[in-house]
Amino acid sequence: MRKIWILLVKLSGWHFEIPDLKDRPELRHCVVAVAPHTAFADYIVGAAVLFAAGVRPKILVKKEFFNFFTRRLLLHLGLVPVDRGNRHNDLVEKAVEMLKNDDNVCIVITPEATRKPVKRFKRGFYEIATKAGVPIALGFMDFKRKHAGYGPTILELVPLHVEQQVQKQIVRQIVVLETATIQES
C-alpha cells in the first residue's frame, strides 16, 4: 500500500528531497516540523515523502478528517487523529510515548496548528522532541514546484525561543526554494 501511495503522489508530479538515512540516522527517529501548512494535501504528500525515506510517519491531524469513509485509509497512512478542542488530551505525552516505543518513527507536526497565517508557532513540537530526547528536522512543501522533503537542517534542542528559531529556518528554506523557482523561469 505504501509503495502504491508513493507512486500515486509521484505520478501527480511531485519530486522528493530525501536525506540518505545511512549518513543521517537521526532523521529516522525525530520530530518533523513542516511548514507552511496550506492544505490537507500536506499530509498526503508528507506521508509519501516519509514512506519513500523508509520511515513510518505518525502525522498528527485534527480528528474532523476522520470519518466512516476515510478513517481506515488515514490510519494506514500514519495519520493520527487529534482532538484540538480538548486542552487536556495529553497529546504531548502520547506523542512522546509513540517515539519511545518505536525507533523507526517520525512524529510529523505543522507547528502553526492551522492553515491561517500565524505570527508564532505553537510549542508542542518542541516539547515532544525535548521529552522524547529526539532532534527536530525541518520539513517543507512547495506546491508551485511540487517539491517536498525533510531533513536539510537538524536543530539542537535549545530551550530559549526555539519556535522562533524553527520558524526563521523554515522561512529561509522557503525563500531559497522560491529563489530557485525564479531562477529556473
List PLM regions with ranges:
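N-terminal membrane-anchoring alpha-helices
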Residues: M1-E17, I182-Q183
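Alpha-helical transmembrane segments and their immediate juxtamembrane flanks
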Residues: L177-S185
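Soluble catalytic domains of membrane acyltransferases
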Residues: W14-Q173, I182
